[in-house]
């Protein structure tokens, strides 16, 4: 029916090798098979050995240089999160390399393992073949290009079985080991490609929000969001977009959230309202904060989690191989699981925005200016926003594995194998897997990066890289000097990586963060200018200061009625560390407020 057979793919690969080796490879048929002599390395021309080694060395070095170049570009552009993700990819490739080496050097010992023949006929992925029919077919068929012997990576020659005892067979054959070796190779290639596509689609989606962010600096935006104007809650754009009579009915509530993720996952009103809510809760109202760049940094932090392969995911990979039994329909289950997870996560994220809109209508009948959304971890499953990211991680891994598995079967067994009784259905499953990739990368993952900002905690990516490192270094210096004591006052009380009250000043750039008393679940910061501190720029990188910078830390806390004393300030001009300040009420602190 016009479908390319998997043998054609193998022939194209062999043709490329034939061209590279100068045409020294010939086609072996069943009639000439007995005349073929399998020569060892000491009987192989040195030019052939050198040519093959040169080919693999050049390809390996080029790949290594490519990864090194990508890492250098990310380092120069201060893309720390993406650089960490690249290191994770390298680590996963190294794990796959170790698996390949173990398969190569352990093949001799694995082939010595014998098991009873009746055990070898259990849990087969394909129906057991008719031995008599198989012998007849083998006598009439010709060998494929270069015969099947060309596929042995480490065995060189299909050695006869060593299980001489009657009723015993090999645990796994040399050809099966080689096919498993090819699967590892496919996993490495598709893991890199899949990770690249996931990140690129996510960044492409968030880049589309840039013109909304630029709009917040215009005079039209200031006029449209006039804080002195009163409006009915149900007349605001955000509430009208997410609420109606049907949203009060649970069934229609989730049906509407399900379909909204496909057509208008994030609109202009959603972005501006969530941006306003984030700044009002975590920063000083009216701050010139580049929310779009912050979301992009947050997405890069999430990508570090998504790109890795944890032991749990390796366990799911082994479980799939174990349960892929004839008649169990494991391949259909493996295709359906990622679809269900991604659709459920997308529906949940849309439901969170709708619940925030309903919360506005329940709290207020009239709002002043733009409606203020109040996020909370209780909106998420089990109160854990990070659980959604782990679910997407599992779904993306399973989806990538299904695509890899399809191409591996196509290459190793062809399009008419027992794995794919109907090749058209297999193509439909691959199309669904690609659709899940686009849906998760372009819609769900950016939506997650946006909605999770409405949680109870602020992510550390709100700080640029330089400020975050400086605050961490200051914190470690304080712990080293004073030790860990119950009465020690630390920046960020819970020991998190993002301090909650600080003022960082430098000779090269001045960045001040002042703490104000707000609602029990929120912190507000003032004076954080990401346009000057954000390192995530598209076309320029920061240059280090010519002279060693000096930092000055001032912590200002609103005075209690019982506090007395004077404010002291310690400055160290010859050190990059920060000095801890013990605040006390004074006239100066009153004026700062």
UniProtKB/Swiss-Prot annotation:
A GO-annotated cellular component: plasma membrane
Transmembrane listed as a keyword: yes
Membrane topology: Multi-pass membrane protein
Region (Calmodulin-binding): 465-486
GO MF term set: calmodulin binding
Biased composition (Low complexity): 489-512
InterPro entries linked: Mlo
UniProt feature, compositional bias: Acidic residues: 528-539
GO process terms (BP): defense response
Subcellular location(s) of the protein: Membrane
Cytoplasmic-side positions: 68-92, 203-304, 348-393, 452-593
Compositional bias segments (type: Basic and acidic residues): 567-579
Pfam families recorded: Mlo
Residue ranges crossing the lipid bilayer per the database entry: 47-67, 93-113, 182-202, 305-325, 327-347, 394-414, 431-451
Record's keyword terms, sorted: Calmodulin-binding, Membrane, Pathogenesis-related protein, Plant defense, Transmembrane, Transmembrane helix
Topological domain spans for side Extracellular: 1-46, 114-181, 326, 415-430
Domain of life according to the entry: Eukaryota
Region (Disordered): 481-593
Domain remarks: The C-terminus contains a calmodulin-binding domain, which binds calmodulin in a calcium-dependent fashion.
Family: Belongs to the MLO family.
Function description: May be involved in modulation of pathogen defense and leaf cell death. Activity seems to be regulated by Ca(2+)-dependent calmodulin binding and seems not to require heterotrimeric G proteins.
Name this polypeptide is given: MLO-like protein 8
Organism: Arabidopsis thaliana
């Amino acid at each position: 029916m016009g479908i390319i057979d998997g043998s054609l793919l193998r022939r194209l690969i062999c043709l490329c090798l034939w061209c590279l080796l100068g045409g020294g490879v010939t086609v072996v048929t069943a009639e000439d098979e007995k005349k073929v002599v399998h020569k060892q390395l000491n009987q192989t021309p040195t030019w052939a050995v050198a040519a093959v080694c040169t080919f693999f060395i050049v390809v390996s070095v080029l790949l290594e240089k490519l990864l090194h170049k990508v890492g250098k570009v990310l380092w120069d552009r201060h893309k720390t999160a993406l650089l960490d993700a690249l290191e994770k990819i390298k680590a996963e490739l190294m794990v796959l390399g170790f698996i390949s080496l173990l398969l190569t050097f352990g093949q001799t010992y694995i082939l010595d393992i014998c098991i009873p023949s009746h055990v070898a006929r259990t849990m087969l992925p394909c129906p057991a073949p008719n031995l008599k029919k198989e012998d007849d077919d083998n006598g009439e068929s010709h060998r494929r290009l270069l015969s099947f012997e060309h596929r042995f990576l480490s065995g060189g020659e299909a050695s006869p079985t060593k299980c001489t005892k009657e009723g015993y067979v090999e645990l796994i054959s040399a050809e099966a080991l080689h096919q498993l070796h090819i699967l590892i190779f496919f996993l490495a290639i598709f893991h890199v490609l899949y990770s690249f596509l996931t990140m690129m689609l996510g960044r492409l989606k968030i880049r589309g929000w840039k013109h909304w962010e630029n709009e917040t600096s215009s005079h039209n935006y200031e006029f449209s969001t006039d804080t002195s104007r009163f409006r009915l809650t149900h007349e605001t754009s955000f509430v009208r977009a997410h609420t109606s009579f049907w949203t009060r009915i649970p069934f229609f509530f989730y049906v509407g959230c399900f379909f909204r993720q496909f057509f208008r996952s994030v609109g202009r009103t959603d972005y501006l309202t969530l941006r306003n809510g984030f700044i009002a809760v975590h920063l000083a109202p009216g701050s010139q904060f580049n929310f779009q760049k912050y979301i992009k940094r947050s997405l890069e932090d999430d990508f570090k989690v998504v790109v890795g392969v944890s032991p749990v995911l390796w366990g799911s990979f082994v479980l799939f191989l174990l349960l892929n039994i004839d008649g169990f329909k494991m391949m259909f289950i493996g295709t359906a699981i990622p679809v269900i997870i991604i659709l459920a996560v997308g529906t949940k994220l849309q439901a969170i925005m709708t619940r925030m809109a309903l919360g506005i209508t329940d709290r207020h009948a009239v709002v002043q200016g733009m409606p203020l959304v109040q996020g909370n971890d209780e909106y998420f499953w089990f109160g854990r926003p990070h659980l959604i990211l782990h679910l997407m991680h599992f779904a993306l891994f399973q989806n990538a594995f299904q695509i890899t598995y399809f191409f591996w079967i196509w290459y190793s067994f062809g399009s008419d194998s027992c794995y794919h009784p109907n090749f058209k259905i297999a193509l439909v499953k691959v199309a669904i897997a690609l659709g899940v990739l686009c849906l998760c990368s372009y819609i769900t993952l950016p939506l997650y990066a946006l909605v999770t900002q409405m949680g109870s905690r602020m992510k550390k990516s709100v700080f640029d890289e330089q400020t975050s490192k400086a605050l961490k270094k200051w914190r470690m210096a304080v712990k080293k000097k004073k030790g860990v004591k119950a009465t020690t006052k630390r920046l960020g009380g819970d020991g998190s990586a993002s301090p909650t009250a600080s003022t960082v000043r430098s000779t090269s750039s001045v960045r001040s963060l002042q703490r104000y008393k707000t609602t029990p679940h929120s912190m507000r910061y003032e004076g954080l200018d990401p346009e000057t501190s954000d390192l995530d720029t598209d076309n320029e990188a920061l240059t280090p200061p010519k002279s060693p910078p000096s930092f000055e830390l001032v912590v200002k806390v609103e005075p209690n009625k019982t506090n007395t004393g004077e404010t002291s300030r310690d400055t160290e001009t010859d050190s990059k560390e920060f000095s801890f300040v013990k605040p006390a009420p004074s006239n100066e602190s009153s004026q700062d407020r």
